C-alpha cells in the first residue's frame, strides 16, 4: 500500500469521524439544548462518505459500469424521447421528478416520535437501501434500452410476473397521486391567500410555455427569471387579496370544492402537450426546490436554531395523536420518500435512462439525487423540530383528537365574522388545554398569535405536514430576512410545496395514463395507441377518476384523510421498492455476480419485514389504538346498528364514510400483498432455473461502443 494512496483517504476518514461525533451528540444529549446544526453537519458528512466509498464500490465491483459503452440516449438519439443530456441538467431533471411531497410530509409526521428516530432512519435507509435501489434500477434500465420496471420484470422473470408488476405499479401510482392531491387540498382549504397564489402558477406556466416555444425559443434563463418575478408577485398580491373585505371571503373555499377543481385541472393538463404546461412548471419547481432547501440549510447555519422537540417522545409506544403505531414497523413506513421510495423506480426506469449520456453518470444521478432528496427530508424534520412542540401537535392533530369542533371558516365575512372568531377562540383554548395535558405546554394566545403572524384565520386542523413545514420555513427565513413578514414567508413555503406537488401530479397523471393504456391494451389493443385522442381521453379519465375517488374519500373522512391514506401510501411505496430490489437481485444472479447480491437482498428483506408486519397489523389487529382496517369498519357498523334513531343523518353519513374507507384500504392492502409475494415467488423460481446454467442469462442489449469523437450533450430538455 503506497503512502500517497493512504494519504488520499485521510480527509475522508476525518470527515467520517466528524459525522460520527455529530451523530453521537444528536443521539446522546438529553435534557440539554441541542442545536439543529449537529443534525445538518452529521447528515452532510454521512452523505459524502457514503457517496465516495459505498456508491463507488457498487459502481466498480457490483455493476462494473463501462464508460466505453454507448447508452440508449446515444444509440437511439431522436431529439425527442432519447436525448443525451448534460449530467448536471439531468441531475436537476431527475431530482425534480423524484422529489415529490413525500420527503416534505413523512418526516414532519414522524417528528411526533422525536427527532432522533427519524434522523437515524433517514441516514441509514438512504445509504443502504434508497440510493442503492435508484442506482440499480437506472443501471439495469440503461442496459435494456430504457425499459420500464414492468417491462424489465417481464423480460427477466416471465410474462405473468411482468403483468402483475404493471398492475401493482399502476395501483401504487393511483395511491401516490391521491395522497399528493390530498396534501394540496388540506393546505389550500379555507386559505384565500394560498388559493390565489397557487392558482396563479397555471397562467404563469402557460405564459412561460408559449414564451419559450414561440416568442424567444431556447431562452431558458430569461424565461425563468420572468417566472420567478411573477411568482413572488403572486405571493405578495395573495396577501393583499386575502385581507380584502370582498375578495378574501370570495376565495375562501371548502375542501370539497378544491377537490373537484383539482380533479378537473389534472384531467385537462394531462391531455395538453408537455411543452405548454409541464416543462415550464418543471423549471420553476426545480429552481424553487433546490433554492429553498439550500436557503433553509444556510439559514439554519446562520441562526443556529435549537431543537425544541425532544429527541424521543412518549409516542414511540404507538399512542401518538397524529398517527397510531409503534416505532417498529410504523416509523419506517411513515417516512416513505427520504429514506427509500419505490416511486423512484418508476422514474429511474423508462424516463431518466433515455436521457443519460454516459453509463458512468448513473452513479451521480441515481445515487447522488437520492442523497439530495434525503437531505430535503432531513430539512423537513429539522423545520418541524424547531417550532414549539405544543404548536406542532395543535396544528397536526385532527379536531376529533383535540376534542374540538372547527367553525366553518368559509362562512366568514359580514356579521358572521365576530361569531366565528369567538368560536375559534374557544377552539384554541380547548386545543391548548388538551395539548398541554400531553406534556407540551402551549397557551391559547400562542395558537391565535401564530395564525395572525402567518396571515391565516386559524392554524388548527392543518394536518398533512405541509403547513407545519411552511411555519418552520417561515421561522428561519423571517429571522434571516426580516424585511418580509411571517405571512409572506409562510405562503412562500406553501407555494413551494404546492408547486412541488402539482408538478408530480401532472407528471404522475401522465405516467398513470400510459400505464393504464398499457394494461388495458392487453385486452383491447386499440387502447394501446398513445397517439390516439380517444384512447388518451379514456386513459386519462380512468386514471384521474380512480385517484379522484380515493382523494374525495380522504377529504370527507371525518377522522382526517391523511390518517387513513398515508399508512397505505407508505406501505405500498416501500413494497414497490422491495419489488425493484428483487428485480436487481435476479439480474445480478443472471449476470453471475451472485457473491454481491447482499447489496440488494439485505435492504429488500428489511423492507419486506417492515411492510408485511405493518400490513398484518393494519389488517388484522384488534387493538383499538392501531385503528386496523377491518376492526374500524366493524366498530362503526356496530355503532350505526346500535345508534338507530338517536343518530343524525350527518353522523350516519360520517360513519358510513369511515366504513367505506376502511374496506377500500383493506382491499388495496390485500392486493399489494398478493402482488409483492407473487413477484418474490417468481424471482426465486427464476433463480432456481438459472442457478446451474454456465454463463450469463440476463437479457441485456448487445454492447455498442461510444462513437468516435465522443458524445454531444444537450443542456436543455
Where are these regions (language model features)?
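Membrane-interface helix-loop-helix modules in multi-pass membrane proteins
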Residues: 24-30, 35, 82-144, 155-159, ...
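Hydrophobic alpha-helical segments and their helix-loop junctions in multi-pass secondary transporters
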Residues: 190, 209, 213, 229-260, ...
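Loop-to-transmembrane helix boundary motifs in multi-pass membrane proteins
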Residues: 156-174, 366-378, 463-465, 483-493, ...
